[in-house]
Amino acid sequence: MASKGTEGGHGGVERKEQQQQRGYQLPRDSRGSLEVFNPSSASSFRTAAAAPKSASPFLAIPDREEDNVVAQQRAAEWGLVLQTDHHTGLPQGVSARPSSGSARTSSEDNPQQQQSAAAIPRVSEELRAALSVFQQTFVVSDATHPNHPIMYASAGFFNMTGYTSKEVVGRNCRFLQGSGTDPHEIDKIRQSLANGSNYCGRILNYKKDGTPFWNLLTIAPIKDEDGRLLKFIGMQVEVSKYTEGKKDTVVRPNGLSESLIKYDARQKDHARSSVSELLLALKNPRSLSESSNNTLKRKSQESLSMSMSEVPSKRSSESGSRRNSRSGTRSSLQKINEVPDQVNRTRKSGLRAFMGFLGMGHGSVEKNMLKPRDEDPLIDSDDERPESFEDEFRRKEMRRGIDLATTLERIEKNFVITDPRLPDNPIIFASDSFLQLTEYNREEILGRNCRFLQGPETDRATVRKIRDAIDNQAEVTVQLINYTKSGKKFWNLFHLQPMRDQKGDVQYFIGVQLDGTEHVQDDAAKEGVVLVKKTADNIDEAAKELPDANLRPKDLWANHSKVVLPNPHMKDTASWRAIQKVLESGESIGLKHFRPVKPLGSGDTGSVHLVELLNTGEYFAMKAMDKSIMLNRNKVHRATAERQILDLLDHPFLPTLYASFQTKTHICLITDYCPGGELFVLLDNQPLKVLHEDAVRFYAAEVVVALEYLHCQGIIYRDLKPENILLHRDGHISLTDFDLSCLTSCRPQVFLPEDADEKKGRKNGSYPIFFAEPMRASNSFVGTEEYIAPEIITGAGHTSAVDWWALGILLYEMLYGYTPFRGKTRQRTFANILHKDIRFPASISVSLAARQLMYRLLHRDPANRLGSYEGANEIKGHPFFRGINWPLIRATAPPKLEIPLFSKDDMEKKGLVTNNRTDMF
């Protein structure tokens, strides 16, 4: 990390002397790293090379001393200290490193050096023990010192940089800088440190041997209860393998990025969340040791793929204090290995997808995850509520929607996508598996033609077949010898397949590689051909979710400029009449037609505002999203899908889209304003943070009806939670936020119950059942942490059954005040979702029917989950919903609550800014 400083005192004199000795005027190291921060106390923290050597111990053998120095350095890299006999110089074993993390050598016998070492801030023994649990790459620095010296460095930091503990502790992290380090990023770091704020960025650093590497640096401040700055934690992740590097600024002729996926923003999102695990240890070292899971070691993962994201909450209410029982924060750059080793051995393949890019691959639900529970799960448990934490960031992180990977990124196969519309048909996407196979970094291959895999023994006739297929826009499957970056050759069963757009024109080429050690014979080749062709088809379907990279930037948002036409049930409302009046005047609805009233919430891509249509008295909610952020966060296709979905909706429990338009910088959606706010806030306002069963039944029933309608339209919602359930003035619900939803086609079915024929069934009240569900499964890693279904985490592909899982979580939260699987960290939450049995606390009385419903909805196998066979009909028929008049549910009066939705004053005030909703249903 870096800091501001002024040059003075003996530090400035020493720097001048060093400049004279090195023969140049500006302070640079061997790599050309500038001392841009001008520390005032640099002399206090000399490197190992500059430190004076003390006399050798009596009778010490010189050669043995050299060996001991090497051993000391290796021990320091593991956080240990080599103990030697001061008379013989013989190693006597190792011991734990002092709390500062600094290994002592015989040179510390020098009194002057002892005094200097004593001035170095050191972490406490308790904190050192807590931090030693983590094997990630990070440092802790002293924020009370102007130079921010390092107090502690993890073993991962030594392994990544090549430096030893003696060379690191007490120094500022600027020694990692070099000639290629971007000074603008350094300025950002300095500003963050000066302000005591967070920083996350990718910078080019240098190892001790001069090797450059891309370092994803995340800095977070540690403050005491009074807000005083104490420490900084700096977490490093080497992302050289996966980042675009300097290619992130390369654009096509149309101005869009050359790469199909923007990795930089995604990596930063992951890292911001990951550092929260270390923050928890620094703020409360005992929290880890006191945890029942304190024996679980965090494993280091030096790739982008294992980190997690932090994005501000979508709605303003999320910044509030919500339930005291909410858990704290820890998210690490690691695979989900936060379960006992015994479980890990049996679950390894099932978690492989999550280990790749937080689930970026195809995994399966393991048998032991689906096995029946030994004890009766419906018996009330005496388990305590999850631990409460005061971490504001963690509270927000748990409740916000996350978008960790597209379906394309989760395909764990060796493949690339090229664009023939660009010169030389360059690579615009490469899978992580392809990078591992070929040993190249992503930065090295983006924008290049695939010919770099060829070598001396590559058959030229086979290469011509591939070129002819490209020229003819046809498929081809061949075997040829290719070479990795290190020169290792391998037989490649290569399949080339064109990907066409809706007009039939070739959009991309998909190249799938099936590697082998030798030439594959005919029978085996046929099996391989089937496999690579199937993979190519999956890639084709997944890539179609993303916008065409050859579109002009303005064309990406063209759908948002289309005029919105009223759907049948809402066209005669006062709101629609006001909108239509503007359109009839010949004007297009735009930002100029609305007056901002107040902000309603904000998120990582934009904000929501209450606005008034000028001179009408009609109020709406306007969602404004920043175009540049949408591009950088790979959310263009999400915004496009949300606009398409809103255009389809015509239901009382779902929002109405009145208009959409774009400005130079934003896209805007105009929908209903719900003065009742979020169900989340309503829950929070209740004395015990829970609702009684009648209220839960009412809200859950309306959610079921809304989800049933969405599924009939081919929409998988994927983000059900109290924050996304808004309340109208009449107390009825409206689901909102469809930016994580999936739109596909629908397959309607009508069938009779199996236990009766048509006549007998009608006499018994068993009428034909209408059932419709989205046809195409998805594999995106999206949702909200506590509500995500197991199949999303494992990467096994998911259907509309994920919405029924989320309904089970919603029921639990409304009844008990918290979600059943939440953990201190995101990884712990995900591990709980995959492994932990659901418990029903005895402290709150909940009916057997309610517990049965939650138990059946929270079945880890989606095929056996309630709602997977007959959809919403199965859920509607559950005993918990007995007494609900489904056809007339809109006429049902909302239940009375301990704290009502509106007070009398609220009714008077909010009634002035409420749409007049005519009941057309």
Swiss-Prot record:
Residues 123-197, 400-473 form the PAS domain. Residues 1-11 have a biased composition (Gly residues). Residues 1-59, 88-118, 286-345, 366-391 are annotated as: Disordered. It holds the Pfam family Pkinase. Residues 97-117, 286-295 have a biased composition (Polar residues). Belongs to the protein kinase superfamily. Ser/Thr protein kinase family. This is Phototropin-1B. It comes from Oryza sativa subsp. japonica.
